Regions:
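Solvent-exposed, non-transmembrane regions of membrane-associated and secreted proteins
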Residues: 2, 12-225
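C-terminal edge-of-domain segments
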Residues: 5
Length: 225
């Protein structure tokens, strides 16, 4: 009887050890996958920063309605082959927002890479910063993907600054206000049409039916050569 109990206890101990080993393996696998994802996201952010830096080293109220289609659901699962590609984009300018650690190039409106699922997207109807009383409109995702360049845009408040580098000129903008807009494929822009402005648009992280619109006004411009 004693031997039977001893064998039974040994079998129980063996099963417990096996369960612990399996649990440890699952935990370690999950941890490595999580660390790998963080590392990849860091690589993407560093790559974009370097590309933007290379570009820099090279040398009355108006109401506008524009089409903006930012669907966060589309970027939850990105194809693996998409992540491995590192296209050599021909940036025409750079957007920098120090408070939320963004320094990212943007493309010509007609460029195939000018797509919210690949880059910052310059919206049709935008003016470049050198156009008098113009309005540069840029949109980006706010989710948790590696292309969610505006994931921290909600942290901006009035008087925070953003810089746009274009045609060897550094344009300094300050946040003048923000508002929510319905997420229906269009955004109505309220701005002072007697000023040069920068409009930043992204999806709300708390309300899937809304988009956040930031209006920034030009404060100064200077050569950065």
């Amino acid at each position: 009887m004693f031997l039977k109990r001893t064998r039974k206890n040994k079998n129980i101990d063996k099963k417990e050890q096996q369960i612990k080993l399996v649990a440890s393996f699952i935990f370690l696998t999950g941890a490595f996958m999580y660390i790998g994802r963080i590392g990849y996201n860091y690589y993407i952010e560093l790559r974009d920063y370097k590309k933007a830096q290379e570009f820099l080293n090279i040398g009355k109220e108006e109401v506008e309605e524009i089409k903006v289609d930012i669907d966060e659901e589309e970027i939850k699962e990105q194809p693996k082959q998409e992540e491995k590609k590192t296209p050599n984009y021909n940036y025409i300018g750079v957007l920098e927002i120090p408070k939320i650690n963004i320094k990212k190039g943007f493309l010509n409106i007609k460029d195939k890479g000018n797509n919210v699922n690949k880059n910052l997207q310059v919206i049709k109807g935008s003016d470049m910063p050198n156009v008098k009383n113009g309005n540069l409109i840029i949109a980006a995702h706010s989710g948790n993907s590696y292309i969610s360049y505006f994931k921290n845009l909600h942290k901006l408040s009035n008087d925070d600054v953003a810089y746009v580098y274009f045609n060897n000129i550094k344009y300094t903008y300050k946040v003048a206000g923000k508002y929510d807009a319905e997420k229906n494929g269009k955004v109505t822009i309220h701005r002072d049409n007697k000023k040069n402005t920068l409009t930043l648009i992204t999806c709300s992280q708390t309300d899937k039916t809304k988009q956040i619109v930031y209006i920034l006004e030009l404060e100064s411009e200077e050569s950065y050569e």
